[in-house]
């Protein structure tokens, strides 16, 4: 594989249940590069779950931490998976310009199926289906804004999504 194909980070964005962590890890393995997940780094460094941070500190504090860690990880090579709401930050959206950003697009039915109705995700408490629909609608334009490529994940396995990203990476060069 050409070194040109793996230089600079490949960034994965998408809503809850789009497969960011699974696809990101598989893609990094396929490319032989490091995989970093912003949410996992937040949990590791804080020693608390995302839900605990939301509950104890509030969403604005979590978003500030997410923005800070995204900015720290974005220059590193490999594959970087952002949290579903990272694109809410104008600073993060601006920082993504010039990077290869893949939006893993997921529909409501698949998102609910993958996330589950009994979820510990802080923004999905209560009516999971309704909250997911709201998130998908509110964030679609922001995902579209940052994406260099849109990958539909609804009817594809994680391995098939990785294949589509690999083909798109070659086409982008």
Language-model-detected regions and their locations in the chain:
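NTP-dependent small-molecule kinase module
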Residues: 1-5, 26, 30, 138-173
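ATP-dependent small-molecule kinase phosphotransfer cores
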Residues: 37-86, 90-95, 120-121, 129, ...
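P-loop (Walker A) phosphate-binding loop of NTP-binding proteins
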Residues: 15
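Conserved lysine of the Walker
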Residues: 20
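Conserved phosphate-donor/acceptor-positioning beta-strand/loop module used by diverse small-molecule
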Residues: 96-118
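Short glycine-rich anion-binding loops that position phosphate/pyrophosphate groups of nucleotides
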Residues: 84-87, 107-109, 156
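Hydrophobic anchor at the beta1->P-loop junction of P-loop NTPases
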Residues: 12
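Hydrophobic positions on the alpha1 helix immediately C-terminal to the Walker A/P-loop
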Residues: 23
């Amino acid at each position: 594989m050409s070194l040109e194909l793996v230089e600079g980070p490949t960034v994965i964005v998408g809503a809850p249940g789009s497969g960011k962590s699974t696809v990101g890890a598989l893609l990094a393995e396929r490319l032989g590069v490091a995989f970093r997940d912003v949410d996992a780094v937040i949990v590791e460094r804080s020693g608390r779950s995302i839900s605990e941070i939301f509950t104890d500190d509030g969403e604005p504090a979590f978003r500030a931490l997410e923005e800070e860690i995204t900015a720290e990880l974005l220059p590193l090579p490999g594959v970087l998976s952002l949290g579903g709401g990272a694109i809410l930050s104008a600073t993060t959206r601006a920082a993504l310009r010039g990077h290869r950003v893949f939006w893993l697009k997921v529909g409501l039915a698949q998102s609910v199926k993958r996330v589950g109705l009994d979820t510990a995700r802080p923004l999905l408490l209560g009516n999971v289906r309704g909250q997911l629909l709201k998130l998908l609608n509110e964030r679609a334009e922001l995902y579209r804004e940052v994406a260099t490529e849109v990958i539909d994940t609804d009817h594809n396995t994680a391995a098939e999504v990785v294949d589509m990203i690999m083909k798109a990476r070659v086409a982008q060069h």
